[in-house]
Regions:
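Alpha-helical transmembrane segments in inner-membrane proteins
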Residues: 1-357
Length: 357
């Protein structure tokens, strides 16, 4: 066997081990999700062991007759909607953040870069403070739909601006920032004229909350998350090419501008679908993809699913901490995501010597 053949075999083996490492990371995150679900479901006013939780989940789907009615009610009607909601939201923001960073070629990008959070906040403030909704009626449905509608307005503005000329990623970011400041100013003006009770409700919504998530909410968020993730996975190779630069993408037959617009639409719909139900939960879409990228690199074929799994773990753990740190009072989950994610991210960033991009 020649020296060249030996080198080729060694390279193939290294690539195989590197791929295995990526798959193992995703599997470990999935196992962590299962463990966190079991433990989080034990936290509440009534004591339920983790074994009882797993048993109830098993019997609930396999043999419902064997379920303890009290435990089943506490687990499936009270605790699991919030837990599964955290899983879906964390996955959605992780995927959207990974795609946004790759699309924009900007390590500071996240799902809210295009102004989605400010648009949603404006819509929620309109609904809560002034009772103005897109449905014409007050209530949770009006709030959700109004927040969803206005969260998509900034992305629509960016798309319209981009249609006038082939704008770069930097221009799209700047347009998003401009719209964000406009919506923030409008939101502040509304807050100046609403009651203290409404102002408190707006604040609670703006810091992110999983406690009001229902199974129907989970179903809608899951639909957007699964569909968006599947489409982004199908586009992952094109996204890898886009990272190398618009000129290289064009040379390989890709229309970088159209691809970026398509990605922006998908990411915006994913982020809007969770923000309208849970409020603004920050840091997940920024930190989760970064941490995954440190371990697995920037190949979106693995980065996207790994960011989904790690984002779910990160948000579920943050929500768990928010429920127990000063129980029975709940801290805003957005505060905990920052406290957990920021030190973890800084530590890994300082420790990591090789470039991630």
């Amino acid at each position: 066997m020649s020296l060249e053949e030996l080198d080729n075999e060694e390279m193939v083996e290294k690539y195989r081990l590197y791929t295995l490492k990526k798959i193992l990371f995703i599997v470990m995150c999935i196992i962590a999700v299962v463990v966190v679900i079991g433990y989080a479901a034990t936290i509440g006013s009534s004591d339920i062991s983790a074994i009882d939780v797993y048993r109830d989940i098993w019997y609930h789907f396999i043999d419902p007759i064997k379920c303890d009615e009290t435990i089943d009610w506490a687990v499936f009607d009270i605790r699991l909607p919030r837990i599964i909601g955290g899983l879906i939201v964390g996955s959605c923001l992780g995927v959207a953040g990974a795609a946004m960073q790759s699309m924009m070629k900007n390590p500071l990008a996240d799902p809210y870069t295009t102004g989605i959070s400010s648009g949603a906040s404006f819509g929620a403030t309109l609904a809560i403070g002034l009772g103005i909704t897109v449905t014409g009626s007050a209530g949770s449905l009006g709030l959700i739909l109004t927040a969803f509608f206005f969260s998509l307005v900034p992305a629509t503005v960016i798309i319209l601006v981009s249609s006038l000329r082939n704008t770069s990623a930097a221009t799209m970011i700047l347009a998003g920032i401009a719209v964000m400041y406009l919506f923030n100013a409008c939101t502040t003006l509304i807050k100046l004229g609403i009651s203290d009770e409404s102002l408190s409700a707006v604040f609670q919504w703006s810091v992110g909350d999983l406690s009001q998530v229902t199974w129907s909410n989970c179903a809608i968020m899951c639909l957007f998350t699964l569909a968006g993730t599947a489409i982004l996975m199908a586009m992952s190779k094109k996204l890898n090419i886009l990272i190398t630069g618009d000129k290289n993408a064009t040379a390989l037959g890709l229309n970088a501008h159209r691809l970026r617009i398509a990605l922006l639409i998908i990411i915006s719909l994913m982020a809007a679908s969770v923000v309208c139900f849970t409020g603004i939960i920050g840091f997940i879409g920024l930190v989760a993809p970064h941490i995954v990228r440190i371990f697995l690199g920037s190949d979106n074929r693995y980065l996207i699913p790994a960011s989904a799994a790690f984002g779910a773990v990160l948000l579920m753990v943050a929500d768990l901490v928010s429920r127990v740190v000063i129980a029975p009072t709940f801290l805003p989950v957005g505060v905990i995501t920052a406290f957990i994610g920021c030190p973890m991210f800084l530590y890994l960033l300082i420790k990591q010597r090789r470039t991630m991009w």
